């Protein structure tokens, strides 16, 4: 197979940042953009008190609450590498959107708060990465505060997340005693100076830990560093590229994102060691990024990114070939040719038209309701990219319209918001009430807020007794019989798929027992 566009593909790095809320993910995102020259000034997010709002948090509700609830895509260049950074929602309730974002990246940066160590959301997200053997780099943040001992943090990561740690840098002190980091491979000592440009004072190369220059520079703290590194040499894992690429080992950096300290060391290692675009699985075969025909898939739909235009954008990951503006591609689900006339690339809310793009790049395609999450586009071959699921909701609310004249607008809003994949909508086989289902409770607030502000619809929620849902499939005759007998509990989702909503786990188990010829599914592939 001839390798097409090899140089451009090898320059691409497409990754996401994962963390527990408040570990500093948005701050790190901003600082990476700062080094990439994509922004001139970091818009610091002070927990829910932001006067300026972080560049990547552009939705109105995010601005009010100081949290990220949608995934943004940002592109920047660093040292001749083209970097696509996908910023994922930090809030617990948005794990479904985050999961889908992780299907579009080749590696991940995990951010850990040095004060708190590994937290629940990080654990959940790492399990998702492990399913796909995604390479993971780690940044332990907030060393400018008093936190847990660095060795204790490594042990926490290894035991809780079941992944080897390979420390790349090591902190000298923490909190008020934080002096900087020692690079275990380049033997460089980088001083922390919050007053200096980008928080970084001098970087001095020493001849190993016994260099008397260290005594001169660090004084009494030098012994602590020597003891730590001696312990590491016996207990820690040396960095191995193959183990990192297989998702078995994570290189670890220490720093303070709010002071921009440690970010450049991380970024330098990232561009050198993180993978370029990788092959992707379809239902029939794996597709190499170096194949000539263009292919890719949609992993996210975002409505109303530009309130002035009420637009909808499909976020599309290129997997092979080269995108050229105006090209015709085959929309596999619809079985028809479409022209992509005006694709864009993103810098949070800023968008620019793109003339060409390569595997690893994320482009935005204007969507008039025909593109759905999970859709595959190719230059003809009947391929379908896999692994972009819908999850069964765990929380449900009935939607009550406050103005009966707005029923059409309500339907449009609910269906469009469901197509973005953060919530799901269900319409009963008997009756007309809309039910919204979500993986997390915050999503209900988001839906109500966006219905009012983007679709001018005022509505209220009413409680319903459902606790879980399952998509149902089966042989036609059996399904018809099932529909007749269980009609009171059956709904169609936003895409017209049949779903069974259960008021208790017992009810679900009982129904499954009584209808063994019917298949009940907790997840559903998009499209």
Swiss-Prot record:
**According to its UniProt record, what is one Pfam family this protein matches?**
GTP_EFTU
Q: Which SUPFAM superfamilies match?
A: EF-G C-terminal domain-like, P-loop containing nucleoside triphosphate hydrolases, Translation proteins
Record keywords, A-Z:
Cytoplasm, GTP-binding, Nucleotide-binding, Protein biosynthesis
**Which residue intervals define the domain tr-type G in the entry?**
10-278
Matches recorded under Gene3D superfamilies: P-loop containing nucleotide triphosphate hydrolases (3.40.50.300), Peptide chain release factor 3, domain III (3.30.70.3280)
User: What are the annotated GO cellular component locations?
Assistant: cytosol
Q: Which GO terms describe its molecular function?
A: GTP binding; GTPase activity; translation release factor activity, codon nonspecific; translation release factor activity, codon specific
For the biological process aspect of GO, one term held by this record is: regulation of translational termination
InterPro entries documented for this protein: EF-G-like_DII, EFG_III/V, G_TR_CS, P-loop_NTPase, PrfC, RF3_C, RF3_dom_3_sf, RF3_GTP-bd
Main localisation = cytoplasm
Query: Which residues of the sequence carry a binding annotation for GTP?
Result: 19-26, 87-91, 141-144
Domain of life (superkingdom) = Bacteria
State the compartments where it is located.
Answer: Cytoplasm
Q: Which family, according to the similarity comment?
A: Belongs to the TRAFAC class translation factor GTPase superfamily. Classic translation factor GTPase family. PrfC subfamily.
**Task of the protein:** Increases the formation of ribosomal termination complexes and stimulates activities of RF-1 and RF-2. It binds guanine nucleotides and has strong preference for UGA stop codons. It may interact directly with the ribosome. The stimulation of RF-1 and RF-2 is significantly reduced by GTP and GDP, but not by GMP.
Q: What is this protein called?
A: Peptide chain release factor 3
């Amino acid at each position: 197979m001839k390798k097409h566009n090899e140089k451009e593909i090898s320059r691409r790095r497409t990754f996401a940042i994962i963390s527990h809320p408040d570990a500093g993910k948005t701050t790190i995102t901003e600082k990476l953009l700062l080094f990439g020259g994509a922004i001139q000034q970091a818009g610091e997010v002070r927990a829910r008190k932001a006067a300026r709002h972080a560049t990547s948090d552009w939705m109105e509700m995010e601005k009010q609450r100081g949290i990220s609830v949608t995934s943004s895509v940002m592109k920047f260049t660093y040292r001749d590498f083209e970097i696509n950074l996908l910023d994922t929602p930090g809030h617990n309730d948005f794990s479904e959107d985050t999961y889908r974002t992780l299907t579009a990246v080749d590696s991940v940066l995990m951010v850990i708060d040095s004060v708190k160590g590994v937290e629940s959301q990080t654990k959940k997200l790492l399990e998702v990465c492990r399913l796909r053997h995604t390479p993971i780099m780690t940044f332990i943040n907030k060393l400018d505060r008093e936190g847990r001992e660095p060795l204790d943090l490594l042990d926490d990561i290894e035991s809780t997340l079941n992944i080897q740690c390979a420390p790349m840098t090591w902190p000298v002190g923490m909190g008020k005693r934080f002096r900087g980091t020692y690079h275990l491979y380049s033997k460089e000592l980088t001083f922390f100076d919050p007053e200096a440009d980008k928080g970084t004072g001098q970087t001095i190369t020493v001849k190993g830990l016994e260099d008397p220059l260290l005594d001169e520079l660090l004084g009494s703290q030098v012994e602590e560093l020597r003891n730590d590194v001696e312990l590491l040499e016996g207990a820690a894992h040396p960095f191995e590229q193959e183990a990192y690429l297989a998702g078995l080992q994570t290189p670890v950096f220490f720093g303070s994102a709010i002071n921009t300290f440690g970010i450049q060391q991380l970024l330098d290692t990232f561009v050198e060691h993180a993978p370029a675009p990788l092959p992707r699985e379809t239902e029939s075969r794996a597709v190499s990024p170096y194949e000539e025909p263009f292919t890719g898939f949609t992993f996210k739909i975002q409505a109303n990114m530009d309130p002035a235009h009420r637009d909808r954008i499909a976020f599309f990951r290129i997997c092979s070939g080269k995108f050229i503006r105006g090209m015709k591609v085959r929309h596999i689900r619809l079985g028809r040719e479409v022209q992509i006339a005006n694709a864009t690339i993103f810098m949070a809310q800023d968008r620019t038209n793109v003339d060409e793009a390569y595997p690893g790049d994320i482009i935005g395609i204007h969507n008039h309701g025909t593109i759905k999450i999970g859709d595959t586009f190719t230059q003809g071959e009947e391929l379908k990219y896999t692994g972009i699921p819908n999850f069964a909701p765990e929380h449900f609310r009935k939607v009550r319209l406050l103005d009966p004249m707005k029923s059409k607008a309500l339907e449009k809003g609910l269906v469009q918001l469901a197509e973005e994949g953060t919530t799901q909508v269900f319409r009963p086989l008997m009756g007309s009430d809309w039910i919204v289902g979500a993986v997390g409770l915050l999503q209900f607030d988001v839906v109500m807020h966006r219905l009012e502000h983007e679709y001018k619809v005022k509505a209220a929620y009413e409680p319903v007794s459902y606790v879980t849902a399952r998509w149902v499939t089966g042989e036609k005759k059996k399904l018809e019989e099932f529909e007749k007998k269980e009609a009171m509990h059956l709904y169609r989702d936003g895409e017209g798929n049949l779903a069974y909503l259960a008021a208790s786990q017992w009810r679900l188990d009982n129904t499954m027992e009584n209808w063994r010829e019917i298949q009940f599914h907790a997840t559903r592939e998009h499209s």
